[in-house]
Structure formats: C-alpha cells, structure tokens
Amino acid sequence: MALSMRKAIGVVKDQTSIGIAKVASNMAPDLEVAIVKATSHDDDQSSDKYIREILSLTSLSRGYVHACVTSVSRRLKKTRDWIVALKALMLVHRLLNEGDPLFQEEILYATRRGTRILNMSDFRDEAHSSSWDHSAFVRTYASYLDQRLELALFERRGRNGGGSSSSHQSNGDDGYNRSRDDFRSPPPRTYDYETGNGFGMPKRSRSFGDVNEIGAREEKKSVTPLREMTPERIFGKMGHLQRLLDRFLSCRPTGLAKNSRMILIAMYPVVKESFRLYADICEVLAVLLDKFFDMEYTDCVKAFDAYASAAKQIDELIAFYHWCKDTGVARSSEYPEVQRITSKLLETLEEFVRDRAKRAKSPERKEIEAPPAPAPPVEEPVDMNEIKALPPPENHTPPPPPAPEPKPQQPQVTDDLVNLREDDVSGDDQGNKFALALFAGPPANNGKWEAFSSDNNVTSAWQNPAAELGKADWELALVETASNLEHQKAAMGGGLDPLLLNGMYDQGAVRQHVSTSELTGGSSSSVALPLPGKVNSHILALPAPDGTVQKVNQDPFAASLTIPPPSYVQMAEMDKKQYLLTQEQQLWQQYQQEGMRGQASLAKMNTAQTAMPYGMPPVNGMGPSPMGYYYNNPY
C-alpha cells in the first residue's frame, strides 16, 4: 500500500512538472518536458528515447545547451528523492560523454557564476525509508562527475596553453567519452538568408552562438605528447587522475545500495571509464619512472609520493574490481589486468630520494668569476718645477730598537738511572775509544834520546833467562835477547804507562806458556785436538773457570767477548763448534773401543796433526806460523 501510494505521488509530481514546463517555459518547452520524463520518479531505467531527444535539441544551438543546464540544475536542487537525483546525474553523465563540448563549457560557466550544479554534499533522501546508503551513493556519484569535469577543464587549459596531456584528446574530448552515435538528424530547412543569397555565397547564421559557427571558429591546437611535457604539467595531470580515482573508489555502494538495480545500472558507465583511467595512470607512472633519476630533488619527492599513493589506490582498485565481477557489473573479459606496484620498487625509489637529499645538503660550489680588473689610471706628466721640497722634521727622535726576545730556556732532562732505551756499546765504539786513548797525547820525552839505565830494576813481568843483566854494551843485549825491556823508557800516547802495556802482552804469554802443557784444542777435557808433538793430557780435567785462560797473539782491537757478535759470525762459529763436537764424539767412541786404557789409547788416536780451535795459533814454536797480532820490541 505504501509503495503504490509513493508511485502514485511520484506520477502526480511528474505530470505537474510537465504541465508547468509546457506553460511557463519561454526558451525550450520541449527540452524541459523531455528532461522531466527522463528524470521521473519511477524505479526503472530512463527511456533512451527521451535522452536522445535531449541530445538532439542541445546540438542545435548554445541557447538549448544553456536551457538544458538550467533545467537539470533546478531539478537536482529541488528534489529530495534519490531516484530522481540519480536519474538526473545519469543524464548529466550521458551528456558529458555523448553531448556537445559546449555542455561542459556551460557547466563550467555556471560554476563560475556560483551555481555549483554537481555539488550535492548536503543531499538527503526524504521520500524513502532506509535510504541512507542510496543517498550516500548519490553524493559520491556527484563528486565523481564534478572531479571528472575538473579534469576536463585541466585538459582544456593545457591545450589552450600549447600543451596536451595525451594524443587521444582533441576538440574538447576528455578521453573518457565513448564513441558517439550518429543520432543527430539533418538540420532543418531554413530560409534563404540563412543558407545563402542568390549568388551562392554563404551567409552568417541568424542565431548567435550556433554550434556550427563555433566549431568553424575553433582552432585545432597542436597535441603535445606526454613525454615532452614539463614536470609541473605531468604532476598536475597525475594529481587530477589520482583524485578522480579516489572519487571512483568511493562510489562503491554499501549496505542496501549494493542490491539496488538502479545503482548497478549507474555503476556500469563509471566502471567502464575506470579502465581508461587506470591506463592513463599507468602511462603517467611509466613516464615518471623514466625521468625519475634525472629529476631535481623536489621533483623526485613528488614522484615518489605519487608512486606511494598510487600503490595504495591500485590495491583498493583490485578489490573493487573483484566485487564488480562478483556482482555482475560489466563482463569479466572487459576488465584490464591490474598490476601492483611492488614494495621493492618503492624501496629503490626511497633510497634514491634519500641519497639525493644528502647530496642536496652539500651542493657543489660554483666558481664565481672574478670581476674584470679596472683599467690602470693614466698618469699625467708631472712638472718638476712645481714640486716643492718638504721642510725638515722638527724634534724627530728615532724610535728605540726593539728589545731582543729572550731565548726560551731548554728544560733540563734528568736521565733515568736505569735507562732501558739507551743503546748498548758496540765493539766498534769500544775500539775507537781505545785507539783515542793510545794516540791522543804527545810522548813524554818530547822525542829526545835517553840512555839505558844500568840499574837492576825489573821493568817487565817476564824476563828472558837468556839475557844477562848488568852488561853495559847495549848492542850485545839487543842481539842476545829481544824481549829484555828493562831499559825502555819510551812513553805511549795519552800518558799510558809502557810497563802496564808490556805487562798486558807478557802476562798472556806467561799464562799461555804455563798452561800449554795442559791445554788442548777444545775444552779442558777435550781429546779431539791435542797439541802437536805431545801426548794427551795426563788426566781428564773439567773445563777451566772463566778468566784463567787468555788468548795470545790476538788483535787487541777485536770485539769484546762480552758483546755478542753479529748473526753471520755466530752462524760460522756454530758450524765450527758443530764440526768439533762431531769429531770429539768420534774420538770418544774410538777411545771406548780401545778399552779406555788411558794415555795408551789416546796416543794411538793422536797420529794426525790437528789445528788449534777458534783460530788460536800455537806459541810453543811448533805448527804453522801464527796469524795473530804480535808485539815486537823495537829496541
């Protein structure tokens, strides 16, 4: 009962509106009647016959277009029924797609005059119960058409400015219009002054603003490809496309509106346009990706934001398309294959933006060109007769010379008593000190000859028994002995006592003479190197303590035994000691084989003559001549 009453009330309202349009309309009553019939209160789809009639009438002149926009705007403003409002929006959508481009211009002009035709943010249905979801869809549908009109205006401004967004748009087509049917009837027969004069020349149309006249005056603008646009133009188009996609995603019906047949019919052209919308967004994203790595930092940030927001929108678009396929809005084969924006691509773009941000903080310094040097002033010749001498200075006192700067006192460094960093004394340094001690000072007798003294004082710790003391003939003393140094008075350089020096050499000879019978080539208990011409030692003795055996006929300037020799000397010494050790082991084995019978066994083994160890020459007159240093008394 309530439904039938509502339908009856709707029919009465429609008939009343039609009657008022026929009587009160001054401009185009037929157009207003067709608009009322196309936006009736019936819960059915509008008849295509009335829509074609409206399209035909609006194609005649600009006046019909203006009347159509005014009538539809008044219909949307007064109605409180979501069915009437939805049919009116579907009519506007059809006119935007298939109508003349002047329809878009009229809506834009009405918007500039303050008449926001598609602004239905405050719409609320009052004719039906539980119609909140339907009213919400009407509001979102109107916002989608409004944003699409903004995109068309943006494209028109781009063409008027010499650029376009894509190659498929021209002559006011925003790229989402479907192919127009050839629904327009031939122009009606006109009078002769409208078609031409008797001479066959065309005349100007009588109605100002005729569609044909405007189309003839409109110039075709050159189309600019998307890749040749400036970054500002590309970002502007991307912003409009993304806002339009947001409005489309918000058109998804909820609640009871998902089961309404009228809403599903209104969704079909919107979903069809979203296919082209998705393709345009992908095209712009591809252009941004190609130019991303060559953009400025601010443009890179804008491109990254566009990619991030597009990734979220595409995820919602995939879910929306799944719902449309399940509901039956359009065929499944018509839907495009939507590709997601991978997180890996977003991470790569984000890392690049961060790198560009770091480089932007420290820009490269630009070399500033130095200003050109001013031309040197031209000096005028000076007249020497005009130059006057300066007067002498009065009470001129020269400034005192500056006081010399005091030299900084060097800090006294107290050496450490136990300085581990101090270098050890080498053998060469010790030899140099000893040589300076020998030859530093002049002789004590100043080069004068002194006769030998006839006293019996002993001047040497070693006296040759062959020299007889007390003889005055010094030539005979020199012939008989060369080692009698008792009468020598020569002083060494540096004040060195000759008695001390001679005693140093003679003391070694004395100890060598005393220990000759006990020494062997190796250690004190060695049997490998006995003295030539002598038998082995009487007993096997232990090695002598340090300091008891001294070497004779050795260079006094040789390196000290307390200082380790170089590595190559140690290696040679080790080879020699290894050889002697091997030889001594062989002799001990032979001695054991002989039964260890003492000197008898050792006598058999000492048949061959061996050399002295360590390069020490013999002093007993046997063997090869000594190779060391000898001290000879010059007297």
Curated annotation (Swiss-Prot):
InterPro entries: ANTH_dom, ANTH_dom_sf, ANTH_N_plant, AP180-like, ENTH, ENTH_VHS. Residues 390-409 have a biased composition (Pro residues). Residues 23-159 form the ENTH domain. SMART domains: ENTH. It is found in: Membrane, Clathrin-coated pit; Golgi apparatus; Cytoplasmic vesicle, Clathrin-coated vesicle. This is Probable clathrin assembly protein At4g32285. Keywords: Coated pit, Cytoplasmic vesicle, Endocytosis, Golgi apparatus, Membrane, Phosphoprotein. It comes from the Eukaryota. CDD domains: ANTH_N_AP180_plant. Residues 165-174 have a biased composition (Low complexity). GO terms for biological process: clathrin coat assembly; clathrin-dependent endocytosis. GO terms for cellular component: cell plate; clathrin-coated pit; clathrin-coated vesicle; cytosol; Golgi apparatus; nucleus; plasma membrane. GO terms for molecular function: 1-phosphatidylinositol binding; clathrin binding. The modification Phosphothreonine is found at T224. It comes from Arabidopsis thaliana. Residues 175-184, 357-369 have a biased composition (Basic and acidic residues). SUPFAM superfamilies: ENTH/VHS domain (SSF48464), GAT-like domain (SSF89009). Its main location: membrane. The modification Phosphoserine is found at S207. Residues 157-208, 357-412 are annotated as: Disordered. It holds the Pfam family ANTH.
